[in-house]
Regions:
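Interfacial juxtamembrane loops and adjacent helix segments
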Residues: 1-11, 145-188
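Alpha-helical transmembrane segments of multi-pass inner-membrane proteins
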Residues: 1-5, 9-93, 97-114, 188, ...
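Hydrophobic alpha-helical transmembrane segments in integral membrane proteins
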Residues: 109-123, 268-302
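Structural marker of alpha-solenoid helical repeat scaffolds
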Residues: 317, 350-351, 384, 418
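TPR alpha-solenoid repeat register
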Residues: 324, 357-358, 391, 425
Length: 442
């Protein structure tokens, strides 16, 4: 269980946990309505448990997904489309008034859901807004698979540098690893081409399920629809169990078609080859992860002279991990290798939106007396996540060290005016240091 959350299941976070629950809910409802006696009883028990647990996760996206998935199952079971069509033909005025009432009810419900965790919703809206600028600048092929976070950090820095933004936007800004919308992330990373391929797979699965004779087809369609609605507000493709569940739902929606054996053999051979090549390299990579975790003990103890050499050996296997690159860059910085450190940290910045990467790069430039580059790094870190005080703190100190007194005072005053997102003893200490800096200079 996560220390910040009371209900996480085995997912360490209520978000993915609620996604797992909501993907099962429509299937449980379907079998409760259509299953045989034992299946109906077991499915009913599961359904009740899911309905009890799901509200406690406080996942608004999961609630909307549950309504969508269960709505599909209920609509099919009670033939609501035909009934509503007949009702509309007989009582047009009544249906019209009822529709208006339902519209206002849904609108009020959505507003209530938004206000439930307003700051979280505003933060996701900012992520989607900034992500849209990446889609605009890289519409066809995207920024590259796995490069969302790094590209997002650059885009958010450009967004806050371009114009004066509201205090509310500055307060909710953060350094996300995902877009909190899988459709948006797919488009950002792989462009319109990737999105169209993904939509083709989804539409194909729905069409196949529609023409399927399977009794479970409706439940699977409801679950897949619920999963996709949840994917509009979260990051299920970044959680392996949910990615496996999504694959299984796609497979269940697409029944096997009879075909020639040799074609099937060729298909499975090509399917197996990438799995084989990936699996053969995993053992060495797993050992590298274990060595990294053991070396982190010395890293946290700040024994950098020992750690830096071992990190260098692990670099070829873990150079796609931004957390490892950040630690390796710090080790190089703390062992008197600022130039090499910045090369490693530049790689990390391509994979992560964390402004601390730019802060360390700025300190490295400052060590090398390259004050212009240091200023650029600190300013970018400040614009990436404007509610953080540390980049401005480092920038003011750098200005003071380099003799840029006016800029030092201006930056120190700017920091004192800032309201930190999470006040702490560290932020209070930084403000005291800035007050002292201004007093000493003047």
């Amino acid at each position: 269980q996560h220390s910040r959350f009371e209900l996480t299941g085995s997912f360490f976070n209520p978000g993915p946990y609620s996604g797992f629950l909501v993907a099962i809910l429509p299937i449980a409802l379907h079998y409760t309505l259509t299953g045989h006696r034992i299946a109906r009883i077991l499915s009913g028990v599961v359904l009740v448990l899911l309905l009890l647990v799901l509200p406690a996760t406080l996942s608004r996206g999961a609630w909307l997904a549950a309504i969508t998935g269960c709505g599909i199952v209920l609509s099919n079971y009670f033939h609501l489309h035909n009934r509503l069509k007949a009702l509309f033909q007989k009582h047009k005025l009544t249906v019209f008034i009822t529709t208006i009432c339902i519209f206002f009810l849904v609108t009020g419900t959505l507003i209530g859901i938004y206000r439930l965790k307003k700051e979280s919703a505003d933060g996701r809206w900012l992520i989607w807004k900034v992500s849209s600028t990446l889609v605009t600048s890289h519409p066809i092929t995207g920024v590259g698979f796995g490069h969302f976070a790094g590209a997002y950090g650059e885009a958010q820095a450009a967004y806050f540098a371009a114009a004066e933004r509201s205090a509310g936007e500055e307060l909710v800004a953060d350094a996300p690893e995902t877009a909190f919308n899988e459709f948006g992330q797919i488009t950002t990373e792989t462009g319109i081409i990737g999105l169209l391929l993904f939509l083709t797979i989804i539409i194909g699965a729905f069409k196949a399920a529609r023409h399927s004779n399977s009794k479970a087809a409706t439940g699977m369609v409801g679950s897949l629809a619920a999963f996709l609605v949840f994917a509009c507000f979260s990051y299920p493709f970044n959680v392996l169990p949910l990615l496996v569940l999504f694959t299984l739902l796609l497979a269940q929606c697409t029944p096997m078609q009879p075909g020639s054996r040799w074609l099937s053999g060729i298909f499975y051979t090509f399917l197996f080859l990438p799995v084989y090549f990936l699996a053969t390299g995993q053992q060495e990579r797993e050992q590298a992860y274990k060595r990294w975790k053991s070396e982190q003990i010395y890293f946290n103890m700040q024994i950098f002279e020992r750690t830096v050499d071992n990190y260098k050996k692990l670099y070829p296997l873990l150079k796609d991990q931004p957390a490892f690159l950040f630690e390796y860059g710090q080790c190089l910085s703390r062992t008197g290798q600022p130039e090499t450190s910045n090369l490693i940290l530049e790689e990390a910045s391509q994979l992560s939106a964390d402004p601390m990467i730019r802060n360390i790069m700025g300190k490295n430039y400052q060590t090398m007396k390259q004050y212009t580059q240091a200023e650029s790094a600190f300013l970018k870190a400040s614009r990436m996540v404007p509610n953080r005080l540390y980049p401005l703190y480092l920038l003011a100190q750098m200005y003071n060290e380099s003799g840029q007194i006016d800029k030092a005072i201006t930056t120190a005053r700017l920091l004192l005016e800032k309201v930190p997102k999470v006040p702490s003893s560290a932020t209070e200490e930084m403000k005291r240091d800035m007050q002292k800096l201004i007093k000493d200079i003047q």
